[in-house]
Amino acid sequence: MSEVTSARRGRPRQTREQAEEVRARIVAATAAVFTRNGSRGLSVAQIIEQAGLARPTFYRYFGNAEEPLHVLLTRSNEGLVGGIRDALTGSDEPVQLGIRLIDAFVGWARGHGPMLRPLFAELHDPASPVSAYRERALEDIRTTVREKFVELGRPVPTPLDLDAALHLCEYVVYRLSAATAPGEEPDPDVLAPARLTMIRVLLTTLGTRADLEYALELPWIFPRE
């Protein structure tokens, strides 16, 4: 009697690339649902409907609806903090550093597209997970800015001055997002004066007399009128 070996039937084992693709699909669906409904309107049912996946598939990767949202918020923080860190390593000239920091902030916001609206709507809501991520990002940015001031041999800004500058940037970027239709780029006629407002405020809160004197020679910051 000959021995017969039968192959195991069933679905083939998922590759790492396939698993990452499904995970990314869930995270993208979470972003879409969050954009429409905010964190309070986030549910597994809506995420799997958006992703076109079965519920067991979702739970193979995430335990609840908040977990993929945390992935999104972590990426958002890394993008903002990393962008500002890169901006502050690109120059040793104080005024240019301030401008680069602002442009990093604006670039981060533009990269979020329509998701920026619910993100900003929940920044100051203690019940939202977005709020905790905001605090972490701000603390990382404070640390990065202080380290750059020390590296340049400049007096470290007071906590109030630094927070005033960062909160102003945050607010202006929010205003830009509120004035921009979902999925569209900010109107250049709105973006240019908003960027200029941030530059002027950073100069006066974090800069020195020498910085202001230098900036006064730049007519695009302070027109000669």
Per-region residue spans from a language model:
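C-terminal peripheral helix-coil segments that are non-catalytic and often amphipathic
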Residues: 1-9, 107, 143-150, 175-225
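Short hydrophobic/aromatic patch on the recognition helix
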Residues: 52-62
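Hydrophobic alpha-helical connector segments
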Residues: 71, 85-111, 165, 192-195
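Amphipathic alpha-helical packing segments from all-alpha helical-bundle domains
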Residues: 78-82, 108, 128-153, 159-175, ...
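Basic, helix-initiating cap at the start of DNA-binding domains
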Residues: 1-37, 41-50, 67-70
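Alpha-helical DNA-contacting segments of helix-turn-helix folds
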Residues: 34, 62, 66-76, 119, ...
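Amphipathic alpha-helical segments used for helix-helix packing
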Residues: 109-128, 146, 174-181
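Short, hydrophobic secondary-structure boundary micro-motifs
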Residues: 43, 117-120, 131, 185, ...
